[in-house]
Amino acid sequence: MRPSGRKTDQMRKVSFERNFSKHAEGSCLVRFGDTHVLCTASLEDKVPGWLRNGGKGWVTAEYGMLPRATGERMRREASAGKQSGRTQEIQRLIGRSLRAVVDLPALGERQISVDCDVIQADGGTRTASITGAWIALHDCLKWMEARNMVKLEKVLKDHVAAISCGIFASQPVVDLDYLEDSAAETDANFVMTGSGGLVEIQGTAEGKPFSEEEFASLMLLAKNGIAELIEMQKLAIAG
């Protein structure tokens, strides 16, 4: 039995609140249960120096957690003077996931920076960030299209979403919350596109290695979960 009482293939309640920020070109407050992440997409009329005059744009991401997003207050990384390895890993993952579905030449020589700020954490912050970041990116591109800067359908090639899976109490489960994640025998994150393409898989065994059969079970849970998330994205942007 899962601590939340959910079935093995049951995700937490997911919601997307678009246009959460009045300043950003695109924004979304995404909720995966008690994990809440504010995703904002900001347009910059420039590209990194190494891309200058290259005829294409760039999409990048930054990730952070508010000091009291967790049970005990964490020190701000800015006050510590450096980002943790975890933060750097997650923001690179978010950026890679978004770029997998963007036609960078169609964006022109512009950069979209997506900031994912965790307001409240209860497991799965990176997967919620990726899934919500896609909505924010979509709305930023829609803002640009309204000003004749790009064609949305030419720049954004597909959906992308992410979900965590793991083996908890010897059972494969989807969308782990913190209690499950901290006690899981295996923990994995999957990033996939709307057409079923795999962007990234991260999987780790805690003590006991997992079998190929167990991995196949996690993969199936992830595939079905991400398909659900992408349908939710479609409903959100249609509203």
UniProtKB/Swiss-Prot annotation:
<dbReference type="InterPro" id="IPR002381">
    <property type="entry name" value="RNase_PH_bac-type"/>
</dbReference>
<dbReference type="GO" id="GO:0008033">
    <property type="term" value="P:tRNA processing"/>
</dbReference>
<dbReference type="GO" id="GO:0000049">
    <property type="term" value="F:tRNA binding"/>
</dbReference>
<dbReference type="InterPro" id="IPR050080">
    <property type="entry name" value="RNase_PH"/>
</dbReference>
<dbReference type="InterPro" id="IPR036345">
    <property type="entry name" value="ExoRNase_PH_dom2_sf"/>
</dbReference>
<keyword id="KW-0548">Nucleotidyltransferase</keyword>
<keyword id="KW-0819">tRNA processing</keyword>
<dbReference type="InterPro" id="IPR018336">
    <property type="entry name" value="RNase_PH_CS"/>
</dbReference>
<comment type="similarity">
    <text>Belongs to the RNase PH family.</text>
</comment>
<keyword id="KW-0694">RNA-binding</keyword>
<dbReference type="GO" id="GO:0016075">
    <property type="term" value="P:rRNA catabolic process"/>
</dbReference>
<dbReference type="InterPro" id="IPR015847">
    <property type="entry name" value="ExoRNase_PH_dom2"/>
</dbReference>
<comment type="subunit">
    <text>Homohexameric ring arranged as a trimer of dimers.</text>
</comment>
<keyword id="KW-0820">tRNA-binding</keyword>
<feature type="binding site">
    <location>
        <position position="86"/>
    </location>
    <ligand>
        <name>phosphate</name>
    </ligand>
</feature>
<dbReference type="GO" id="GO:0009022">
    <property type="term" value="F:tRNA nucleotidyltransferase activity"/>
</dbReference>
<dbReference type="InterPro" id="IPR020568">
    <property type="entry name" value="Ribosomal_Su5_D2-typ_SF"/>
</dbReference>
<keyword id="KW-0808">Transferase</keyword>
<dbReference type="Pfam" id="PF03725">
    <property type="entry name" value="RNase_PH_C"/>
</dbReference>
<feature type="binding site">
    <location>
        <begin position="124"/>
        <end position="126"/>
    </location>
    <ligand>
        <name>phosphate</name>
    </ligand>
</feature>
<dbReference type="GO" id="GO:0000175">
    <property type="term" value="F:3'-5'-RNA exonuclease activity"/>
</dbReference>
<dbReference type="InterPro" id="IPR027408">
    <property type="entry name" value="PNPase/RNase_PH_dom_sf"/>
</dbReference>
<comment type="function">
    <text>Phosphorolytic 3'-5' exoribonuclease that plays an important role in tRNA 3'-end maturation. Removes nucleotide residues following the 3'-CCA terminus of tRNAs; can also add nucleotides to the ends of RNA molecules by using nucleoside diphosphates as substrates, but this may not be physiologically important. Probably plays a role in initiation of 16S rRNA degradation (leading to ribosome degradation) during starvation.</text>
</comment>
<dbReference type="Pfam" id="PF01138">
    <property type="entry name" value="RNase_PH"/>
</dbReference>
<dbReference type="GO" id="GO:0006364">
    <property type="term" value="P:rRNA processing"/>
</dbReference>
<dbReference type="InterPro" id="IPR001247">
    <property type="entry name" value="ExoRNase_PH_dom1"/>
</dbReference>
<protein>
    <recommendedName>
        <fullName>Ribonuclease PH</fullName>
        <ecNumber>2.7.7.56</ecNumber>
    </recommendedName>
</protein>
<keyword id="KW-0698">rRNA processing</keyword>
